[in-house]
Amino acid sequence: MYISLHNHTAIGSNTRGFLDSINTVEKMVAYAKELNHTGLCITDHDSLTAHIDLLHHIKSLREKDPEKWKDFKPICGNEIYLTSKKNILEDKDYSKLYHFILIAKDEIGYDQLRKLSTRAWCDNSFTFVNIRTPTYFDDLTEVVRDEKGHLIGMTACLGRQCDRMIVEAYNLDQENPDYSLVEKWLRAMDKLFGHGNFFLEMQPSNQEAQILVNKVILELSSKLDIPYVITTDAHYLKKEDREIHEAFLKSDDNGDSREVGEFYNTTYMMSEAEIHSYMDEYLTPEEVQVGIDNTQLVYNLCEEYSLDKPLVIPYKAFDATEPSPELYAKYKDKVPLLEYFYNSEHDCDRHMCREILNKLEDRPEEFQNQPTYDALRDCLNAIIVSSKAQNTQWSGYLLVCKELIKTVWEAGSLCGVGRGSGGGFFLLYMLEIIGFNPLREEVKTFYWRFLHEKRASVLD
């Protein structure tokens, strides 16, 4: 059984202005299932962007077909650029940004991924300008040791430190290469993550360097008692997509600034048979199968968890005055949905009701008419449905926006009269968030572009 543990997506690995992958989460999941993989792990280049899409997509598939997808496990990881502060801050040696895979075993592990990625991006922004974001050994050590046992480490591709040390040692003495530095580094990483949470990584490839590394990893795995796994570092979906991926990589500068050829020949999602077809030429089928089966060790170590958080809208009552009972009695039949807000247990709902009633009363020529009542009905209904669907009160959001706009004007600054879909939501005009009446516009705008009861989502 096999799970692909090293994969890149277009949504995550291309975020740094560095063209990398053409994979989509949906197609990867579908193809992984077609190949009988037991799950999918996303490990974009220092980006956690695609994880929420992966978890949501698997959740939706399980809702449609629970039996088919119940054991298909989504796993979240990150391919970092591991280095020392000396390399970057003192030597300014940006070639020593070594690839390394981190995989979250659980929610605590995912929080550690977030901490490390945040530090890496901050160091990238304030230390030097580079499309690769450094994760320093010191930071990795600190975060992992704070709560040990929640992250899995894997040695990644040919861009990793141990691979470079293997190739350098071999080139120095091909007859009797000294891999002691590699062994020292691997032992240190195994100790850092905890034995059983660190894996050596092989990849199928026709490159001589990768074949050499795979052979040495086999020896070191046995010698150091560190298991190895086989990954494909997927940047595109299928073998026949190779030319499309190459054209994508060349689309910005024709590939002048990077290698776009040989390395990527085998970086696609593979079946077990395809992996064997590449690797059985220099390893035994049994040795290859061990690397395939060992991916299930990672599968078993990883729990499933949700990244969803409750939507919390902060609300401060700038005016705590309750709505007037007299005004409510006057307008409740004209705008029946006001009852929901007038009788609500939430302050923000009642305060918004107050604002609406006051506007209806203060500007009778503009607001006391049937088109206004109809527009209010549509807007209030959309807010009620959306608030219930998301277990929050969107009235609080609108009242805070109202105060922000008011503050801008009172400070003597300028604020745009409105933009986008909000320009069609009549209630925003009554709350003075936008500066024009949508009902008077010659070009018709629609409230449902901003919020609709059948599309209960976060507001613009």
Write out the residue ranges for each language-model feature.
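Domain-core and long-helix interface of multi-subunit machines
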Residues: 1-42, 46-70, 115-241, 348-400
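Glycine-rich loop at the start of a catalytic domain that most often binds anionic cofactors/ligands
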Residues: 48-64, 88-89, 243-246, 429-440
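Non-catalytic structural connector segments
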Residues: 1-5, 13-15, 164, 169-172, ...
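Acidic/polar active-site rim loop that often engages polyanionic ligands
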Residues: 85-101, 115-118, 272-274
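Conserved phosphate/anionic-ligand binding catalytic regions in large, soluble enzymes, centered on
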Residues: 229-238, 413-435
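A structural-propensity feature for long, helix-poor, extended segments
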Residues: 450-460
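Acidic, His- and aromatic-enriched active-site or binding-groove loops in soluble protein domains
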Residues: 73-74, 78, 99-107, 220-229, ...
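A residue-level signal for conserved active-site and pocket-lining positions in enzyme catalytic cores
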Residues: 44, 74, 106, 153, ...
